[in-house]
């Protein structure tokens, strides 16, 4: 809970298992799961039968939001302000509970609207979703970008995971900080 994660994946891997695990755990805890992806993507195909998962399917075939099914809404791929609005409404709909958001894929966004717009969108999204009760995972195809683009996007995340053909490998996770109470409990009194 409370992490913003960049999941860099090899498209030949079974990276969707990481998303399935996140969704399964969240649903077991009765937490909402919101996934931004393309219809027919690997993630969409693997989780679309889960009616409790809300999909926002990004496409160039609509210019305004359009309800597709009970748990699927079509959104224009190039309308990042609308995506930010959906993030905002999701947060407002669940003001007290934990929220799980998956954004698949940053690579599609970079290739569709360009890197600068994607980076601006990401800065706003990461700030908006920064809360200890939100778990947010953004996916990036490791083979789709030059090193400068990858490095810039990585810089927005303190938690980075790589999922290759051999499975999941943690790249960068911050050290766990002890709470002040735990620190005080272990220290001698009266200094």
Identify the meaning behind each predicted range:
Residues 1-45:
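Glycine-rich P-loop/Walker A and Walker A-like loops and their local beta1-loop-alpha1 context
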Residues 65-126:
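Phosphate-binding/switch loop-helix module in NTP-utilizing enzymes
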Residues 117-144:
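Substrate-engagement module of ASCE P-loop NTPases
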């Amino acid at each position: 809970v409370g992490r913003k994660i960049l999941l860099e994946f090899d498209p030949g891997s079974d990276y969707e298992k990481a998303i399935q695990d996140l969704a399964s755990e969240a649903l077991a805890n009765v937490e909402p799961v919101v996934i931004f992806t393309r219809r027919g993507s690997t993630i969409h195909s693997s989780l679309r039968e889960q009616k409790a998962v809300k999909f926002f399917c990004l496409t160039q075939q609509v210019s305004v939001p359009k309800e597709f099914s009970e748990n699927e809404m079509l959104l224009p791929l190039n309308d990042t302000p609308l995506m930010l609005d959906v993030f905002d409404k999701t947060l407002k709909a669940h003001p007290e509970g934990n929220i799980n958001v998956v954004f698949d894929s940053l690579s599609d966004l970079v290739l569709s609207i360009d890197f600068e717009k994607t980076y601006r969108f990401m800065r706003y999204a990461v700030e908006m979703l920064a809360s200890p009760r939100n778990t947010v995972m953004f996916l990036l195809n490791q083979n789709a970008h030059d090193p400068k683009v990858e490095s810039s996007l990585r810089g927005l995340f303190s938690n980075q995971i790589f999922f290759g053909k051999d499975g999941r490998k943690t790249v960068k996770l911050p050290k766990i900080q002890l709470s002040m109470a735990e620190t005080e409990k272990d220290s001698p009194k009266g200094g």
